[in-house]
Amino acid sequence: MKVLKPIRELIDRDRVFDVVNPSLRAPELDVSHGTVLYLEDISVSFDGFRALNNLTLYIGAGELRCIIGPNGAGKTTMMDVITGKTRPDTGSAFFGQTIDLLRLSEPDIAQAGIGRKFQSPTVFEQHTVFENLELAMAGPRGVWTMLFARLSAEQRDRIDSVLTLIGLQHLRLSLAGSLSHGQKQWLEIGMLLMQDPALLLVDEPVAGMTPQETERTAELLLSLAGERSVVVVEHDMAFVRSIARTVTVLHEGSVLAEGSMDQVQNNQRVMEVYLGEQL
C-alpha cells in the first residue's frame, strides 16, 4: 500500500526527533552567568589522530558565533561532542551552569535544548511544509498523535509563527520535495525551531545556495540570535563577515584565534595557517 511508506517515514523521523517524546523531561537551563555553553580542555582522538586538542570555548547566551578553520581543524568533532555523538577522552562540556552534556545521551541533549542542523537538509519530501513542522513540534505529539489528532489553536499559531519566520508561509501546503535547496534548509531550521532550542548549531548553511538565498539565510540567522544562541560553522567568508560579531578560528583541534572578523583576518598566526587563502 502506498500509504505505508509515508507512515514508516514518519515513524523513522519520530525516532530521530526523540524530543517529541513526552516521557522525557528536560533539565532546567541556567544561564544566569550569561554563558550558554562551556567547553573546557576537550580532547578527542581517533586511531592516534587528535581531532580536538584541549579545546576550550565559551558561547554567550543569545550570541551568534561563527566558527571557521581549515579542513580537519576539528569543527565537526566539536559539534559531535556538544550533541553527544562523540564522547571526549578528556575535558568537560556544560550546557548552562548545571547541565553536564557528557552525562546525557543524544536524545537527552536535544531534549535539554540543543538543536543541530547538518549541512545537507533532511526533510519529509512527500509531506507538506506544514506537516514537516507539525511532526517536529515539541511536546506530546508523536507520530500517531499527529496522524489521528487535531492541532489546537495554540499549536497552529506556533507553526504559523515559524512559517513566517523562515519565509515559507506562502508554501505551507507545498510538498517539501518541491522546494529549492535553500528553502529546504530553511524548513529544517524551522523544524528545529519547533523544538524551541536554546542553542542552535548550524553546519555550512549556505553551501550550494544562490546569492539571494544566502542573503535571506543571513537575515534568518541574525533574527534568531538574541532569543537563543546560534553557532554557525561556515567556509564562506563573505557570509561569515555579513553575520558575525565574534569569529573563532580552529586549527588542529584548538582555538587559534578569536575576535571580530577584522581582528581574525589580520592575525598573523591565522594568515600563516591559511597560507595566503583569502579570508
Outline where the language-model segments fall.
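The feature captures the beta-strand-to-loop junction immediately N-terminal to the Walker
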Residues: 68-70
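ABC ATPase NBD Q-loop/coupling interface
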Residues: 92-111
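Helix-to-loop junction immediately C-terminal to a conserved catalytic motif
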Residues: 83
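Conserved ABC ATPase "signature" region
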Residues: 21, 27, 146-171, 198, ...
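Catalytic Walker B motif of ABC-type/P-loop ATPase nucleotide-binding domains
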Residues: 200-204
